[in-house]
Amino acid sequence: MKKIIFAFIILFVFLLPMIIFYQPWVNALPSTPRHASPEQLEKTVRYLTQTVHPRSADNIDNLNRSAEYIKEVFVSSGARVTSQDVPITGGPYKNIVADYGPADGPLIIIGAHYDSASSYENDQLTYTPGADDNASGVAGLLELARLLHQQVPKTGVQLVAYASEEPPGDDANLLI
């Protein structure tokens, strides 16, 4: 009987650590996160509101720099990228379009405008940085592009950065 008890004690002493410290095999997490990067969102908003500010209709060079930045991000995300001239006085303004997934079938369109407003206050022209109207929307659009690069959708997705939502254009609905 003592031998049986001793055998159980030895077995228990060896099995207990194995039971306590046993870790099941798990797959490694993907090397790239599948969520939006707060740092990248902030970087894009800062670029649009500080580096290429103002982005209003009377600052076509900054609008073009913004469009190039957006286009570069779309291209690096593996999208089929096109630009569309928007026929508005004072332009040409450009919509930047990125297509993901199948070219045929249903299409989900998500957009944000990259121009910002200007106005006259006390007979002086003022420019808004446009962080919440709509640099933050463009930042979200570009992060979505990065995420779509990681997992190609089964339904067509079109991301559109509009150039002329603010006056004098007010024509973000002009997707040609």
Residue ranges and their predicted role:
Residues 4-21:
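Hydrophobic membrane-insertion alpha-helices, especially the h-region
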Residues 18-65, 77:
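N-terminal capping segment at the start of a domain
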Residues 34-41, 56-67, 91, 107, ...:
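Solvent-exposed, acidic/flexible segments
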Residues 47, 95-99, 107-113, 156-162:
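Soluble periplasmic/extracytoplasmic beta-strand elements of cell-envelope proteins
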Residues 47-103:
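A non-catalytic alpha/beta surface segment that caps or lines the substrate-entry region
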Residues 87-89, 102-104, 114-118, 164-168:
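Solvent-exposed loop/turn segments at secondary-structure junctions
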Residues 106, 117-127:
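Glycine/charged-rich beta-loop-alpha catalytic/anionic-binding loops adjacent to active sites
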Residues 128-176:
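Acidic/histidine-rich catalytic neighborhood of metal-dependent amide-processing enzymes
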